[in-house]
């Protein structure tokens, strides 16, 4: 007789944490708010109940060989992250979940029609963020429809992985194993980095920091395995991201200047000029990506862009050079780097932004 997934002691520990969170959210007001947190918690618990220990999956003769190989590599990467990168691995990535879709959650971003300031949702513990994650695409689309009805630009994007910041033992899943070996390992380092430092309401800081750990971690990982030349592929992806960011900065500069005229220009004029800027950006991206060997940050051209795409993209990529310079300033000593990042994170937002801008100006590749 076929039985369902067993509840392991690790799952029981996490289940007790979920019950605690359920008790906490009952103090929140509004049916929509409670419904949102309920889907988030039950969605994560759904992953946990389907998770199996990685060694068991590796030892199962019915597991495809490529999955076994990726999971064995993931165990090595966990050890490397703990011993060489000083990351707080704990019990993360010790279980595996096979998903029926390429993403684990989807994020919704909503931005007013004539603004680049996204709507912000506020959450317990992590503060306010410019996106809202859903385990159900249907739920995300329902919320998207509400914003569209109020004239917002919106974007829904699939997310390969997310971090619970150490609250739970995050599992591996098929979103990881679908990636190439290097990208899977890099993503593991990235998600573990969020456990080190996380500044509430500063997505740019958090994501730039995690990407810097991801990049240097991957460089050291490949070097240890005698595959240092493969780091060039990661740098090429970073270069594509930076080239796209340059285009986005130019477009957002034009849009910001346009939106400042919202009180003096007719809406039809604003829409026409906005669309001209976005169309130019899409065309510039198409031309830029023609020689790339894989899709860029916005995916394969042609692309349709709006305020929400731009607001999300520029949040994630701004200060990677600054954090990489800070790491180099500390001799690639990760514990010292983490302490410096924690100190930086305690500064007022404008001061830490200025510090990262100064660091970014000093950065040169291959230090």
Question: Over which residues does each language-model region extend?
Answer:
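Metalloprotease/metallohydrolase-associated module, dominated by Zn2+-dependent proteases
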Residues: 33-40, 47-55, 175, 182, ...
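Bacterial N-terminal signal peptides that target proteins for export
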Residues: 9-19
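Acidic/His-rich structured neighborhood in mature extracellular/periplasmic domains
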Residues: 77-241, 253
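N-terminal amphipathic/basic-hydrophobic helices that include classical n-h-c signal peptides
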Residues: 1-11, 222
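C-terminal motif of bacterial Sec signal peptides marking the signal peptidase cleavage site
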Residues: 29-30
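Amphipathic alpha-helical packing elements
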Residues: 44-81
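Pan-zinc metallopeptidase signature
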Residues: 249-367
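Acidic/histidine-rich, surface-exposed loop or edge segments in extracytoplasmic proteins
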Residues: 48-63, 121-129, 303-305, 321
């Amino acid at each position: 007789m076929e039985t369902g997934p067993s509840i392991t002691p690790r799952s029981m520990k996490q289940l007790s944490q979920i019950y605690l969170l359920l008790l906490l959210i009952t103090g929140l007001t509004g049916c929509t708010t409670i419904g949102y947190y309920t889907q988030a918690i039950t969605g994560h618990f759904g992953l946990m109940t389907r998770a199996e220990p990685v060694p068991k999956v590796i030892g199962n003769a019915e597991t495809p060989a490529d999955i076994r190989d990726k999971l064995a590599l993931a165990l090595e990467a966990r050890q490397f992250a703990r011993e060489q990168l000083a990351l707080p691995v704990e019990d993360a990535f010790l279980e595996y979940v096979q998903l029926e879709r390429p993403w684990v959650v989807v994020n919704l971003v909503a931005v007013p029609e004539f603004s680049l300031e996204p709507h912000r949702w506020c959450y317990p513990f992590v503060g306010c963020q410019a996106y809202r994650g859903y385990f159900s695409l249907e739920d995300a689309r329902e919320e998207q429809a509400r914003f569209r009805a109020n004239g917002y630009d919106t974007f829904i994007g699939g997310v390969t992985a997310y971090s619970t910041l150490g609250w739970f033992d995050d599992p591996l899943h098929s979103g990881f194993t679908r990636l190439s070996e290097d990208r899977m390992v890099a993503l593991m380092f990235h998600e573990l980095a969020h456990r080190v430092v996380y500044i509430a309401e500063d997505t740019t800081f958090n994501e730039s920091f995690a990407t810097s750990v991801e990049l240097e971690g991957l460089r050291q990982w490949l070097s240890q395995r005698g595959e240092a030349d493969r780091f060039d592929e990661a740098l090429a992806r970073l270069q594509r991201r930076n080239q796209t960011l340059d285009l986005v900065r130019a477009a957002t500069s034009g849009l910001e200047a346009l939106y400042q005229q919202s009180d003096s220009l007719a809406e039809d004029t604003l829409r026409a000029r906005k669309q001209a800027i976005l169309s130019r950006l899409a065309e510039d991206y198409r031309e830029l990506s023609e020689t790339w060997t894989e899709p860029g940050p916005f995916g394969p051209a042609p692309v349709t862009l709006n305020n929400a795409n731009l607001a999300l993209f520029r949040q994630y990529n701004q200060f990677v050079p600054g954090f990489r310079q800070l790491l180099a300033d500390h001799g690639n000593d990760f514990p010292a780097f983490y302490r410096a990042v924690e100190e930086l994170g305690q500064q007022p937002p404008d001061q830490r932004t200025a510090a990262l801008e100064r660091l970014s100006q000093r950065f040169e590749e291959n230090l």
